């Protein structure tokens, strides 16, 4: 049977209880099994790194996923979703290095690669378990015992298989290119891994001496002085106009400079020149005949072996000088230009960011520390035209935050540029939420994509499955562990991590030995193969053939350049199509001011702290309802607490009828809604219709992943329609006899609505939904599904839908609100009845609503009658005040205006208005008995209220409240005041609903006592008083005795259990 619940919502208690129930009943597995005959839905979880505690962003991400999957499950989708864990790469290595106190790769090598690998493995697995428990506390349902983990050999094989596909399709390439490089981690990093932030760097203008021309210099600008020792060329734009001009200093000294004509003034300003004279102009293409000298040739001997020339490039812009310093070893554009013109790819910098021997005098110096040294050397050689600083957005390593540099190194690449057009076609075939996430944001990123550098010079990652012969140089790409063991002639098993796999060699046809290249995969390649790796492909094709590609994925908007992109690239290589059918892009979590959360700013919020204080359902409801999923979520504690209060109200909504239902032994299995249909009131039909409308609205919202709208619809329904309206309407019906059809109708309707709302909230607030389901449904129907999450999603019952009634009720609620405002103006509390409410409707629909729901209107306005005027008609008891217009009267009557105005004010308003309407004028009798004609423009009119009334506007029209008291109304008002206080005292004693009491009330004011005595029986009935002593001098006693001030009248009240 239905049982009472605790008075207060206790999230911690409920969540522990429900979690235990889920575990004991094996609810997750049974829920999935229950949907085996449904349409399949394959979801791929974007794997978080196992680096420690979850944060608000990862919590929001998992909550979105869980909510959508629960919704799909209830809509009979058979779901496959394994949680994923990214357990390789720099995110893990950097954390382990921190634990071990390592500063560089040398520390790792000294410690031993195998030891380091084992530490990384141990760290990743330990953190995975901790984070799993944290996600489970959010109420997230996934196959937690069977996650996909990127460190597992079967997962690694999926990456190997994909790379072999790339090799076989000629989409794998090895070569020297200038790539993003982290000097601390000593590895290449992908474009998508570069994080940009503000940084201040040197800004210098350098003069390159033109060979064969006296005192003539090409002027370049750079923010990386450290790259000057690697300079091999200057680039200019072929179509820009350049000038050779004489620049004159204050002391009369001069030199000839070359720069873009448009930028001469900037160059003069930077160099602090006093004057100039243009000697000649030419297009950029005419400068290619020039050669120049390195400004540091005496310090970097290799520079003297290079022929420095001027070359054309479209990437040159009209900024600074229009001449660009080219160092092919330290920039992608520079590198490409160098390759095009067969220039030396000079890269005198090592993996740790220090100059090599090729840098001559600079060898051994860190490039960042070398900037001021290079500047001083340029200054000493009169090659520095100007120096300053610039603050700009600069790339940093995504994990250790070190500023990146560009190095020309040998790397492995996927030829994304060769499949880019097909990738763009596939983007159009995917459903994107919102649409612009794919059509604009993602498309733009892919359009600008370069070949993907997939190799990393690190340790803890998926090893590149490339074996190279030391003798003949032949390459072999291995696709699986079985293939490797077979080709290596091994019979046992091996682990596919470094250094274990590094020890495996493969015989070469030339008689030599193939050894694995030392690089590991870019960690983004790990997660790129998730959609087939989680299906155990390529070891088995069964699940892959049944489920792939993914029906749905969702991640943050940074993944347009991350996981969405890497998945698409890898899938195009492996299968020639996108690995997902639909994608939801969500936003970032920020603080209330819109700033990114970071430990340094002290604005990080732990989702676990929120759960500990307010519960998981509160956190879920907050992040889901705060904004559209694709907008950034600005965390605001006050808003979280508001959501928590809403859930408390929802709890109270559920709690309200339970004591009465339990007391009456109400059994919804015995009394159906259909059996009491003849006893349904209009308000019952209305709430049933509203419930259907909410189902429709939530379905519509969920179809477009508008999770915020879905949650808001449900909470608004619970708070506004149920708590603040319907429950207030039916409250008196719950106090009648147990078998009263009117009461049973209210119970049945409430039960029907509660069953609906319990199911509606279940994807969003799974703990609260389960708690209520077990009490309301499972306790009365043992044949019901074991868990709310096994239930079918509510279907719209068209027989309950009545849109016209919903509109009518909205109209009535607007009138009630206006009546409340008018009461305040009249100084009459709602507890005190009024004789009548007058409504002047503006439309036939409003009048019809009042007629249809008159009883509701009377009840909620606490009035004895509802008076309805004609549509668009004024209330016939209104007065009409005449307001003379001196501006119109004065010019006509001049000195007599002082006699006309007071006489006009005394005319009965309706008479004057009628005369004006019929003839346009009125014969006005003055004080001396003479008459004068006044015209319609000389007076305005203002309606006046009868004494004791007040008015307010509503959506339906004007509403008037007659607040005049009669003795009967006054008696009822005082009676209601007494009842309220006695009920408060019952609550204070925590009495059960049906517990009878003894009451004594002393009222010394004889007039008030006489009024209250007329309704003594009503008071006794309302407060369940078997004994009720009332008088002006009686002794007041009881378990609880209190003094009260009731509308200025002193009363003493006492109550006691019978």
From Swiss-Prot:
<dbReference type="InterPro" id="IPR001412">
    <property type="entry name" value="aa-tRNA-synth_I_CS"/>
</dbReference>
<protein>
    <recommendedName>
        <fullName>Isoleucine--tRNA ligase</fullName>
        <ecNumber>6.1.1.5</ecNumber>
    </recommendedName>
</protein>
<dbReference type="InterPro" id="IPR002300">
    <property type="entry name" value="aa-tRNA-synth_Ia"/>
</dbReference>
<dbReference type="GO" id="GO:0005524">
    <property type="term" value="F:ATP binding"/>
</dbReference>
<dbReference type="GO" id="GO:0004822">
    <property type="term" value="F:isoleucine-tRNA ligase activity"/>
</dbReference>
<dbReference type="InterPro" id="IPR009080">
    <property type="entry name" value="tRNAsynth_Ia_anticodon-bd"/>
</dbReference>
<dbReference type="InterPro" id="IPR014729">
    <property type="entry name" value="Rossmann-like_a/b/a_fold"/>
</dbReference>
<keyword id="KW-0547">Nucleotide-binding</keyword>
<keyword id="KW-0030">Aminoacyl-tRNA synthetase</keyword>
<dbReference type="InterPro" id="IPR002301">
    <property type="entry name" value="Ile-tRNA-ligase"/>
</dbReference>
<keyword id="KW-0067">ATP-binding</keyword>
<dbReference type="InterPro" id="IPR009008">
    <property type="entry name" value="Val/Leu/Ile-tRNA-synth_edit"/>
</dbReference>
<dbReference type="GO" id="GO:0008270">
    <property type="term" value="F:zinc ion binding"/>
</dbReference>
<dbReference type="Pfam" id="PF19302">
    <property type="entry name" value="DUF5915"/>
</dbReference>
<feature type="short sequence motif" description="'KMSKS' region">
    <location>
        <begin position="596"/>
        <end position="600"/>
    </location>
</feature>
<comment type="function">
    <text>Catalyzes the attachment of isoleucine to tRNA(Ile). As IleRS can inadvertently accommodate and process structurally similar amino acids such as valine, to avoid such errors it has two additional distinct tRNA(Ile)-dependent editing activities. One activity is designated as 'pretransfer' editing and involves the hydrolysis of activated Val-AMP. The other activity is designated 'posttransfer' editing and involves deacylation of mischarged Val-tRNA(Ile).</text>
</comment>
<keyword id="KW-0862">Zinc</keyword>
<dbReference type="GO" id="GO:0002161">
    <property type="term" value="F:aminoacyl-tRNA deacylase activity"/>
</dbReference>
<dbReference type="Pfam" id="PF08264">
    <property type="entry name" value="Anticodon_1"/>
</dbReference>
<dbReference type="InterPro" id="IPR013155">
    <property type="entry name" value="M/V/L/I-tRNA-synth_anticd-bd"/>
</dbReference>
<dbReference type="Pfam" id="PF00133">
    <property type="entry name" value="tRNA-synt_1"/>
</dbReference>
<keyword id="KW-0648">Protein biosynthesis</keyword>
<keyword id="KW-0436">Ligase</keyword>
<comment type="subunit">
    <text>Monomer.</text>
</comment>
<feature type="binding site">
    <location>
        <position position="599"/>
    </location>
    <ligand>
        <name>ATP</name>
    </ligand>
</feature>
<comment type="similarity">
    <text>Belongs to the class-I aminoacyl-tRNA synthetase family. IleS type 2 subfamily.</text>
</comment>
<feature type="short sequence motif" description="'HIGH' region">
    <location>
        <begin position="48"/>
        <end position="58"/>
    </location>
</feature>
<dbReference type="GO" id="GO:0000049">
    <property type="term" value="F:tRNA binding"/>
</dbReference>
<keyword id="KW-0479">Metal-binding</keyword>
<dbReference type="InterPro" id="IPR033709">
    <property type="entry name" value="Anticodon_Ile_ABEc"/>
</dbReference>
<dbReference type="GO" id="GO:0006428">
    <property type="term" value="P:isoleucyl-tRNA aminoacylation"/>
</dbReference>
<keyword id="KW-0963">Cytoplasm</keyword>
<dbReference type="InterPro" id="IPR023586">
    <property type="entry name" value="Ile-tRNA-ligase_type2"/>
</dbReference>
<dbReference type="GO" id="GO:0005829">
    <property type="term" value="C:cytosol"/>
</dbReference>
């Amino acid at each position: 049977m239905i049982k009472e619940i605790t008075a207060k919502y206790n999230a911690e208690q409920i969540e522990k209880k429900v979690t235990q129930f889920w575990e004991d009943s094996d609810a997750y597995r049974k829920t999935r099994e229950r949907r085996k005959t449904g349409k399949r839905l394959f979801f791929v979880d974007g794997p978080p790194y196992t680096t420690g505690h979850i944060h608000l962003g990862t919590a929001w991400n998992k909550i979105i996923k869980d909510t959508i999957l629960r919704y799909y499950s209830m809509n009979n989708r058979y779901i496959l979703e394994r949680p994923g864990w990214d357990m390789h790469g720099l995110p893990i290595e950097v954390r382990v290095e921190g634990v071990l106190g390592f500063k560089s790769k040398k520390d790792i090598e000294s410690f031993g690669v195998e030891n380091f690998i084992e530490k990384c493995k141990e760290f990743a697995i330990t953190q995975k378990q901790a984070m799993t428990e944290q996600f489970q506390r959010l109420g997230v349902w996934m196959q937690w015992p069977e996650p996909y983990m990127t460190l597992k050999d079967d997962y690694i094989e999926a990456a190997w298989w994909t790379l072999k596909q790339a090799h076989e399709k000629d989409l794998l390439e090895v070569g020297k290119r200038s790539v993003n490089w982290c000097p601390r981690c000593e590895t290449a990093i992908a474009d998508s891994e570069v994080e940009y932030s503000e940084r201040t760097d040197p800004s210098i203008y350098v003069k390159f001496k033109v060979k064969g021309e006296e005192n003539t210099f090409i002027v370049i600008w750079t923010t990386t002085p450290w790259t000057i020792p690697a300079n091999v060329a200057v680039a200019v734009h072929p179509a820009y106009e350049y000038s050779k001009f004489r620049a004159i200093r204050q002391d009369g000294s001069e030199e000839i400079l070359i720069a873009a004509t448009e930028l001469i003034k900037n160059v003069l300003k930077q160099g602090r020149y006093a004057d100039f004279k243009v000697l000649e102009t030419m297009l950029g293409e005419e400068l290619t005949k020039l050669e120049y000298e390195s400004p540091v040739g005496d310090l970097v001997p290799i520079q003297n072996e290079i022929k420095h020339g001027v070359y054309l490039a479209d990437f040159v812009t009209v900024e600074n000088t229009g001449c660009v310093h080219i160092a092919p070893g330290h920039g992608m554009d520079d590198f490409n230009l160098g390759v095009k013109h067969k220039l030396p790819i000079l890269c005198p910098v090592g993996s740790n960011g220090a100059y090599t021997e090729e840098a001559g005098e600079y060898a051994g110096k860190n490039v960042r520390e070398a900037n001021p040294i290079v500047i001083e050397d340029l200054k000493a050689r009169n090659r520095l035209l100007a120096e300053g600083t610039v603050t700009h957005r600069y790339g940093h390593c995504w994990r250790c935050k070190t500023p990146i540099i560009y190095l020309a190194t040998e790397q492995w690449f996927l030829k994304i540029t060769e499949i880019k057009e097909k990738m763009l076609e596939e983007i159009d075939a995917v459903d994107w939420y919102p649409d612009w996430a794919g059509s604009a944001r993602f498309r733009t990123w892919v359009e600008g994509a370069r070949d993907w550098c997939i190799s990393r010079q690190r340790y803890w990652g998926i090893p590149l499955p490339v074996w190279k012969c030391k003798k003949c140089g032949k390459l072999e790409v291995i696709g699986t562990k079985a293939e490797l063991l077979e080709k290596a002639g091994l019979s046992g098993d091996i682990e596919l991590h470094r250094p274990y796999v590094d020890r495996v060699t493969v015989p070469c046809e030339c008689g030599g030995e193939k050894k694995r290249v030392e690089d590991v995969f870019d960690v983004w390649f790990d997660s790129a193969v998730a959609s087939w790796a989680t299906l155990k492909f390529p070891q088995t094709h069964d699940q892959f053939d049944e489920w792939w590609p993914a029906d749905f994925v969702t991640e943050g908007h940074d993944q347009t350049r991350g996981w969405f992109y890497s998945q698409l690239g890898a899938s195009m290589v492996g299968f020639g199509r996108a690995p997902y059918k639909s994608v939801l892009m969500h936003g970032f979590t920020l603080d209330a001011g819109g700033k990114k959360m970071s430990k340094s700013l002290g604005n990080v919020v732990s989702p676990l702290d929120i759960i500990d204080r307010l519960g998981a359902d509160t956190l879920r409801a907050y992040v889901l309802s705060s904004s559209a999923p694709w907008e950034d979520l600005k965390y605001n504690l006050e808003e979280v607490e508001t959501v928590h209060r809403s859930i408390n109200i929802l709890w109270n909504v559920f709690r309200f009828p339970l004591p009465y239902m339990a007391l009456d032994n109400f059994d919804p299995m015995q009394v159906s809604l259909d059996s009491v249909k003849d006893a349904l009131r209009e308000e019952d039909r209305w709430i049933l219709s509203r419930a259907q409308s909410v189902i429709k609205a939530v379905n519509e919202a969920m179809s477009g992943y508008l999770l915020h709208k879905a949650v808001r619809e449900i909470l608004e329904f619970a708070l506004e329609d149920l708590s603040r309206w319907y429950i207030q309407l039916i409250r008196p019906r719950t106090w009648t006899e147990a078998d009263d059809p009117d009461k049973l109708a209210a119970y049945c309707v409430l039960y029907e609505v509660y069953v609906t709302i319990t199911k509606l909230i279940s994807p969003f607030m799974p703990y609260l939904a389960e708690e209520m389901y077990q009490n309301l449904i499972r306790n009365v129907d043992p044949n019901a599904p074991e868990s709310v999450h096994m239930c079918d999603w509510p279907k719209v019952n068209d027989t309950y839908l009545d849109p016209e009634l919903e509109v009518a009720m909205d109209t009535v609620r607007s009138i009630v609100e206006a009546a409340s405002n008018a009461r305040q103006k009249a100084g009459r509390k709602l507890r005190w009845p009024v004789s009548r409410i007058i409504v002047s409707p503006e439309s036939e629909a409003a009048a019809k609503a009042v007629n249809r729901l008159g009883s509701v209107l009377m009840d909620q306005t606490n009035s004895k009658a509802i008076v309805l005027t004609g549509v668009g008609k004024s209330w016939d008891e209104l007065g009409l005040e005449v307001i003379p217009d001196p501006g119109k009267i004065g010019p006509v009557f001049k000195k007599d205006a002082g006699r006309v105005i007071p006489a006009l004010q005394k005319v009965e308003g309706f008479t004057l208005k009628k005369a004006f309407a019929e003839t346009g004028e009125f014969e006005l009798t003055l004080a001396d008995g003479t008459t004068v004609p006044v015209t319609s423009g000389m007076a305005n009119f203002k309606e006046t209220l009868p004494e004791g009334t007040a008015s307010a506007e509503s959506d339906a029209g004007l509403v008037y409240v007659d607040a005049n008291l009669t003795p009967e109304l006054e008696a009822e008002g005082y009676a209601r005041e007494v009842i309220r206080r006695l009920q408060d005292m019952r609550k204070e004693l925590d009495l059960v609903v049906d517990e009878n009491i003894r009451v004594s009330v002393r009222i010394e004011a004889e007039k008030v006592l006489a009024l209250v005595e007329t309704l003594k029986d009503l008071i006794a009935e309302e407060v369940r008083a078997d004994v009720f002593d009332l008088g002006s001098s009686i002794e007041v006693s009881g378990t609880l005795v209190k003094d009260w001030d009731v509308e200025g009248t002193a009363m003493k009240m006492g109550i006691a259990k019978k």
